Structures are given as C-alpha cells and as structure tokens.
Amino acid sequence: MSTPKGAALVTGGAKRIGAAIATALARHGYDVALHYHTSAEAAERTARDIEDCGRRCRLFRCDLNDHDETAALVPRVREQFPRLNVLVNNASVFESATLRDTGRDLFERHFNIHFKAPFFLTQAFAEACSDGHVVNILDTRVRGSDPRHAAYTLSKKALLELTRMAARELGPAVRVNAVAPGMILPPPGGVVDELERRSAGLPLKRIGDTANVVAAVLFLIDNPFITGECVYVDGGEHL
C-alpha cells in the first residue's frame, strides 16, 4: 500500500453521490472516514470498494441531527486518521414541503443536516488543520427558488453562504469550495425517466452522472488557488 495523501471524511458516504465521491478519493490516494447514519449495509459495501482500491476505510455512525454526536465526529475520526485533510459535507435529506406546509421538525431536520452539521464539522476540522480542503455538496437550486422544497432549498442556500464565509476566514490553512449538482440522480424512489424528460430543457439536453460530480470535487481539491467557489454540475440548468 502506497503512502496516502492524507485522509478524507465524507458525510453521507454510504451510497449515491457520497459513495461515488468516497471511492474516487480512495482511488486518488486518500484513506477514507466514511460517515453514515442508518445505511449500515450500504456503508459496508462502499467500505469494501474503498479497500479494494488499496486504501484504508473506517466507518463512523453519527446522527447529524444530534449536536453532541456531530461535535464528537471529527475528534473520533482524528483518532483513526491523524492526517485528516479533506472534509466533504455531502449528507443530505430531501423532503417536499412548501413554506406553508413546512413544520418545525422538517425545517430543523433540513437545517441540521445541511447547515448546522457542516458548520460545526468545518469548525472542528479547521482547528487542527494547516493544509486542508472542505467541499460542500449543494444543489443547483441555490441559484433560484423552489417553493415545493422550501426547507431543502433554503438550507442549501445557507450552506453556500457558509462556503463563502468560511473561505474568507479559514484561508490560507483551509480552502472551502462547493459543488452544486443538478440532474444527476433521481430522488430515492424516483425514476430516471422523469429526469430524462426534464433534461430536454437544459442547454446540454441530457442528465449527468455521478462521475461528473466526482470530477468537480477532485478538481477543487487538487487546485491550490481556488477557494470560495461553487461549481455548478448541472448541464447549464442554473443559467
């Protein structure tokens, strides 16, 4: 096994885009701290894929709705991976509700996972990092308004502002950037056919795939002169 470039903590890394990012980071030379909450079997499968790349992987269960559990996550990871130098805030929840229909629990769930947890994870990550990078996974909706998913859209917008604010404060020791995917995967339980139908209205007239998101994440990590940037991986949907 070659010497790793460091270690990456990927939240929500058990499946979907998170699993693709975590596995790509392993291929790119990073050991991986794979966070999950309820998807234990999927996390174990992704961990095996990472280890097949010749890198170490450890699983970290944590409920990001719980502040105490969230506050303990980075210290737990550093016990296993002292060279933690990449944080990918990918964990997400996606629930439909307009402003009128959004209850307190749904609101807090979205803001806890999309904003509060990344805020405190970034804070803890930066405390003991002299050359690190944070990548926040957003959504192309941050460029507009989606009243059908009020809490989701607003919480992702808050994460975009955190990206910019943290980039200004934490440099040069820590760079902070974001990737905003568009039509990549349907929501859990959704169908690809619906995305393909909607993609006809995009400038590029097709849906993307997880490899497109992964490429943007790796580009940002590898480029030492980019911070505070958001890369839209959405086929032009944000235009």
Residue locations for each model-derived region?
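Conserved Rossmann-fold SDR core element
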Residues: 25, 160, 170-184, 226-233
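The beta1-alpha1 cofactor-binding region of Rossmann-like NAD(H)/NADP(H)-dependent oxidoreductases
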Residues: 40, 61-72, 104, 210-212
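Conserved NAD(P)H cofactor-binding loop of Rossmann-fold oxidoreductase domains
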Residues: 90-95, 235-236
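Conserved glycine-rich cofactor-binding loop
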Residues: 14-16
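Active-site Tyr-X3-Lys motif and surrounding loop/helix of classical short-chain dehydrogenase/reductase
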Residues: 72-79, 97-101, 105-112, 197
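Catalytic loop of short-chain dehydrogenase/reductase
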Residues: 96, 133-171, 183-184
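Catalytic Tyr-X3-Lys loop
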Residues: 93, 100-119, 135, 152, ...
